[in-house]
Amino acid sequence: MQSTGAPGLAQSAVLQLSAMGERSRELGGALREPERKRRLLLVVVCVALLLDNMLYMVIVPIIPDYLADLRGERGNSSADLDIQIGVLFASKALLQLLVNPLSGTFIDRVGYDLPLLIGLLVMFLSTCIFAFAENYGTLFAARSLQGLGSAFADTSGIAMIADKFTEEAERSRALGIALAFISFGSLVAPPFGGILYEFAGKRVPFIVLACVCLADGVLLLTVVKPFSDRTRENMPVGTPIHRLMVDPYIAVVAGALTVCNIPLAFLEPTIANWMESTMDASKWQMGLVWLPAFLPHVLGVYITVRLAARYPERQWFYGALGMVIIGASSCTVPACKTFGELVFPLCGICFGIALVDTALLPTLAFLVDVRHVSVYGSVYAIADISYSVAYAMGPVVAGQIVHNLGFVQLNLGMGLVNVLYAPALLLLRPVCQIKPSFSERNVLLEEGPSGLYDSIRLEERALRRKGLSAGAGTEHGLRGRSEEEEESGPESA
């Protein structure tokens, strides 16, 4: 009986191993499907952006109290504490601002996968250091290290979305989803950090974020091969970042991204003290004042994506309208006397920012497509620089303006700058007018693949557009390169 049972057990084990191998091959094949792979990469990028913004904001309710305890031990003054908090908040954006030109060039040369993995690993290390930091110097190092990780993860993530989703409507939709995750991370992090800090201690919020970051990195490794030489061999030569910076259309978009984020960046470090002195706000009110703004932000993203799908030539108008809404809302903030009243202008600011970001981030990729080479690392490094300028100045400059001029003057100035900048987006109108014809032309192209990820897109295009002829009109006058350069970049799906 034992002699006949052993072969049966062995055969059963072989069959089970064979079935497991078959399931693994099926899973690997499913992950290699272009559409599914593209969606998984969108999930990876959105989680990375969520983590970065949660880590940026989760320290808001934790660090002041933690540094106050350290101050009690060392006898530092309250003024020194305010300076330490301001420098700590600004250090991330400052380092991100310095590293972005280098990270953008690096992304253009090696692709999007490896820089995203590097960014996630650095963010994981930064989060772990935050969890176990015991002094201000270590906290400062962790905060600065987060800026280094963000320069790689944020830029490569947004650039990867632009590269994978090349049709204008789906690109706007994918970038809109990413922006919703950014907003959710920024707004939910303070209550998340405050609750866990209150009931579980300082380390727990950071350990949770570190675990999610590690899981996101593992998911990225299952979807792509960041160390593959094939990707780097197929990379077209991108336009240098200094040439993109002097492009007038890209400069207008970068300026708008900076200006529209100034109210949010300047109000975050100043509004709590103003609420306490003006309306005697409680701690929970100061902690939750931004949370209701999440819904208007998501609504703004949704509306802009739907409008961009139907009227892509009006992207400049959506951005200009958003800046006017931001300006008007910023001017009304000082007039609020209660917590309920204050929620409305803050919602207006976030709604306007959603309009501007959702309209202009896809426009940056489109500008690179029609005027340069379709490689997006450097152009989205410029976008990240624009955000970093606002958030680097916020914690340092806003407090000085409030101290010297007053909170009312700060808000009126921010509102006026946004309203005055809005007409500058009229300069984008000629470029936005060609969006429908350019999108149609790219959809009908049938040349062979030559750029990054073009093979995947060619397969998708053959499946979706089978039987269509390649005879659309041309837009040579608006392209800043020859036909060979034009087709070397990623093509539309």
From Swiss-Prot:
Ranges facing Cytoplasmic side: 1-39, 108-113, 165-174, 225-247, 306-315, 369-378, 428-493
CDD domains in UniProt: MFS_SLC18A3_VAChT (cd17383)
Membrane association type: Multi-pass membrane protein
Composition bias type Acidic residues, residue spans: 483-493
Region of interest called Disordered, as start-end residue ranges on this chain: 467-493
GO CC terms of this entry: AP-1 adaptor complex; AP-2 adaptor complex; terminal bouton
A single BP term in Gene Ontology: establishment of localization in cell
Protein name: Probable vesicular acetylcholine transporter-B
Organism, as annotated: Danio rerio (Zebrafish)
